[in-house]
A protein has these predicted regions:
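Intrinsically disordered, low-complexity terminal regions
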Residues: 1-255
Length: 255
């Protein structure tokens, strides 16, 4: 009787499939990685230095550190992107819109600044994160869509504005300070030190969603226009706080 022949799969074929998949993925990612360009440079900084950045699109993170140096690191999506920071005795200015007449894709920034810096950041789209800055002013402006996150802030003037996106504001309010936070569509969350004294005007015309939480027992407030607007004072009212949200919530949290 003739014995049946059993066919075995090719001994190397099973192990080759994961290798081929990995090679295919590498081929797909290689052009993207090759197209990117990285910029990194340090600039000596004096006290009360100013950082100004005007970007088109991309994520921007600014973090304060204990060094007399501004460190700018940027990853550019396109190798044709240009960036020529201007360094003066007053600070560093980066204008991506001026240096690139056409859209060159995302440029993502990570920047380190001294604690006492003034920070002025503007982008057409993309998120902005600013942490632990204690200078005279902090400004974050997103023309279209992008979240804004300001944490550990201790500045006399703070302005944050976007069209679509959330705003997180975690700060100590200073006597005589001015704080303005506005969004058209998104949620605004304010975590403020409980010892801060401030005058408040909060407006949510579409949602009427304004939640004072613990501050409701710490100050005096009046509601207007069917709770679309809240005006009041906490403590000595030493700072001015104004926030408007067209189509989202405004939530206050003492910390």
């Amino acid at each position: 009787m003739k014995q049946a022949t059993v066919k075995h799969p090719h001994p190397g074929r099973g192990g080759a499939r994961p290798l081929l998949a990995a090679l295919a993925l590498a081929c797909l990612l290689a052009p993207q990685a090759a197209a990117q360009r990285k910029f990194s440079r340090d600039y000596p900084a004096q006290s009360n230095i100013r950082l100004q950045l005007l970007n088109r699109s991309g994520r921007i993170e600014v973090v304060a550190w204990d060094k007399s140096t501004i460190r700018v690191t940027a990853v550019m999506e396109s190798r044709s992107a240009k960036m020529e920071p201007e360094a003066t005795a007053d600070g560093v200015r980066i204008d991506v819109r001026r240096d690139n007449r056409e859209d060159v894709g995302d440029i993502n920034f990570t920047i380190r600044v001294p604690y006492d810096s003034t920070v002025d950041i503007s982008t057409m789209s993309g998120g902005i994160v600013i942490r632990n800055v204690r200078g005279e002013m902090v400004r974050a402006h997103v023309t279209s869509e992008g979240d804004i996150e300001l944490t550990g802030i201790r500045a006399r003037t703070v302005m944050a504005e976007n069209t679509v996106g959330n705003i997180l504001f975690d700060a100590e309010l200073l006597r005589g300070g001015t704080y303005v936070l506005n969004s058209t569509q998104g949620d605004i969350q304010l975590r403020i030190t409980a010892e801060s004294g401030f005058r408040l005007m909060a407006v949510a015309p579409r949602t009427r969603n304004i939640d004072l939480n613990g501050f409701a027992q710490m100050g005096e407030f009046e509601f207007f226009n069917e709770k679309r607007k809240v005006v009041g004072k906490v403590g000595d009212g030493g700072a001015s706080l104004s926030t408007t949200n067209g189509r989202g919530s405004i939530v206050f949290m003492p910390r």
